């Protein structure tokens, strides 16, 4: 039990007590704007945060002056008539303050992240940020495992849970009051996390703010996994301990310590599995194991009860699905992944005797589901729900080359993300939809027919929809007898993809 108490030890020297005064500093808002340009700790591009050119120094000074004059905003949560966010710029001022607040709240987390990387001597690498790096890991590990659990991270049932989560790391009462104010404002505008909304549906104008809250909440829920994994295995754990310093977690788990004081090691023995692997992206996580179905049920039961009893989160058991890898498709990051048993017959000739040997190899396959992807393309108005291409409205001053480049860029981005698919028929279907949609858009602009327009452009139009990997593969396999066959089956994982394309994110 000493190990558990040491793991939950409070590190008071790293708590941040005076963050709220930073909200009145101009450089914080400049920093928020620069982070939007260069990417924040969560590696999101500027356009996702809703920033525009309005963030001038004059507006920032005007906002800070107003906050100085009405500093009681943090105390007026229950009084909707008292707020600094009034007038025709209410939404913009509110967005600016929430963005600045999010940058301030990121400070302790970024410091701990840097400290953790230095302690573990982990080199900063952009490749490690790629979400495509998950699939080579799957390909190497999942083919040797038996069961997989699809886990949906539980949502908070009350706004105060989010506040208390940050309270575990930040001892700054004014900042916490301001956080409550923001949450109540967003609750009134129906922009908060709900069981029916995923992180991709957060308010585009304040995504940094929600990412901060969501990540802190998720890491709090995952803490039990990290602890049990470290205690139940002698193998080296690569899980990050950056977000595991909490001030109130010990109090929440005190009852568990008393109950399991005598049987703690026996309880940990139930979770021993040297072949356990855990991966998460956004609100979905995967727990894969070589163990039995009974072991996976024990993990499921423990997680559900722990979330319910010690984090005050209602997590329904049906949010964790246990399946065998051999007869189940795993839907993750826009791919349908599975492990298939490939059987082949090998003939062996030894002097006068010949043998036929059956060999079976587990093969990891990744497919792109056609129906959800067509649904995403239809939602973007490139086709109807049946997959028939339609024309899009464009600006009258848009040139033909700009329109063609735009459609070609969309397809190349989609193909780039789904380049790891074992079969490319889905991508060929999407290419057909985007090409014909582009042709119909141009024909509509010039008041012509699609046939006449394609005849005029010829092969130049088709080359815009050639992807980089298709061009590279054509050079690599140009001496083979069937380059199209090889490129059709080739899987490529890229290490420069740090987020899901909006069209690819059809979850």
Swiss-Prot record:
Biological process terms in GO annotation: mRNA processing; RNA splicing; tRNA processing
Disulfide bonds: none
Location(s) in or outside the cell: Plastid, Chloroplast
Pfam family, one: MatK_N
Keyword terms, alphabetized: Chloroplast, mRNA processing, Plastid, RNA-binding, tRNA processing
InterPro entries: Domain_X, Maturase_MatK, Maturase_MatK_N
Function: Usually encoded in the trnK tRNA gene intron. Probably assists in splicing its own and other chloroplast group II introns.
PANTHER family, alphabetized: MATURASE K (PTHR34811:SF1)
Name of the protein this chain belongs to: Maturase K
Source species: Magnolia figo (Banana shrub)
Taxonomic lineage: Eukaryota, Viridiplantae, Streptophyta, Embryophyta, Tracheophyta
Gene designation: matK
């Amino acid at each position: 039990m000493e190990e558990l108490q040491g793991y939950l030890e409070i590190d008071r020297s790293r708590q941040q007590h005076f963050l709220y005064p930073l909200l009145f500093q101009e450089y914080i808002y400049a920093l928020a704007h620069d982070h939007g340009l260069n990417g924040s700790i969560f590696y999101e591009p500027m356009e996702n945060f809703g920033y525009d050119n309005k963030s001038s120094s004059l507006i920032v000074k005007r906002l800070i002056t107003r906050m100085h004059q009405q500093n009681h905003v943090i105390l007026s949560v229950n009084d909707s008539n008292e707020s600094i966010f009034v007038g025709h710029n209410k939404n913009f001022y509110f967005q600016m303050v929430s963005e600045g607040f999010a940058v301030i709240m990121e400070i302790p987390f970024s410091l701990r992240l840097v400290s953790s990387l230095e302690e573990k001597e982990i080199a900063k690498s952009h490749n490690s940020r790629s979400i495509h790096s998950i699939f080579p890991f799957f390909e190497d590990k999942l083919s040797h495992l038996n069961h997989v659990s699809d886990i949906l991270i539980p949502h908070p049932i009350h706004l105060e849970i989010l506040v208390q989560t940050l309270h575990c790391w930040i001892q700054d009462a004014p900042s916490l009051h301001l956080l409550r104010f923001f949450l109540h404002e967003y609750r009134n505008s129906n922009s908060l996390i709900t069981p029916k909304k995923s992180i991709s549906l957060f308010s585009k104008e304040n995504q940094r703010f929600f990412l901060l809250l969501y990540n802190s909440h998720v890491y709090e829920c995952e803490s039990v996994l990290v602890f049990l994994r470290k205690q139940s295995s002698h193998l080296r754990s690569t899980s990050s301990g950056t977000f595991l310093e909490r001030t109130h977690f010990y109090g929440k788990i005190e009852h568990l310590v008393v109950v399991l004081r005598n049987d703690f090691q026996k309880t940990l023995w139930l979770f021993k599995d040297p072949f356990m692997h855990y991966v998460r992206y956004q609100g979905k996580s995967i727990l894969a194991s070589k163990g039995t179905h009974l072991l996976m049920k024990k993990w499921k039961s423990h997680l559900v009860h722990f979330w319910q009893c010690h984090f005050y989160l209602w997590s329904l058991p049906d949010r964790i699905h246990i399946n065998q890898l051999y007869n189940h498709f795993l839907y993750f990051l826009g791919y349908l992944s599975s492990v298939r048993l490939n059987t082949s017959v090998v003939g062996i000739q030894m002097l006068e005797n010949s043998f036929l040997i059956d060999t079976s190899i587990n093969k990891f396959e990744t497919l792109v589901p056609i129906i959800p992807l067509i649904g995403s393309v239809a939602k973007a108005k490139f086709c109807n729900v049946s997959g028939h291409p339609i024309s899009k409205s464009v600006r009258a001053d848009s040139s033909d080359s700009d329109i063609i480049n735009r459609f070609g860029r969309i397809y190349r981005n989609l193909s780039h993300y789904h380049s790891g698919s074992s079969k490319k028929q889905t991508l060929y279907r999407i290419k057909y939809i985007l090409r014909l949609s582009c042709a119909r858009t141009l024909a509509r602009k010039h008041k012509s027919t699609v046939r006449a327009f394609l005849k005029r452009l010829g092969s130049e139009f088709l080359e815009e929809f050639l992807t980089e990997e298709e061009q590279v593969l054509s050079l690599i396999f140009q001496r083979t007898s069937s380059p199209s066959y090889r490129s059709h089956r080739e899987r490529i994982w890229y290490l420069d993809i740090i987020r899901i394309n909006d069209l690819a994110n059809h979850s």
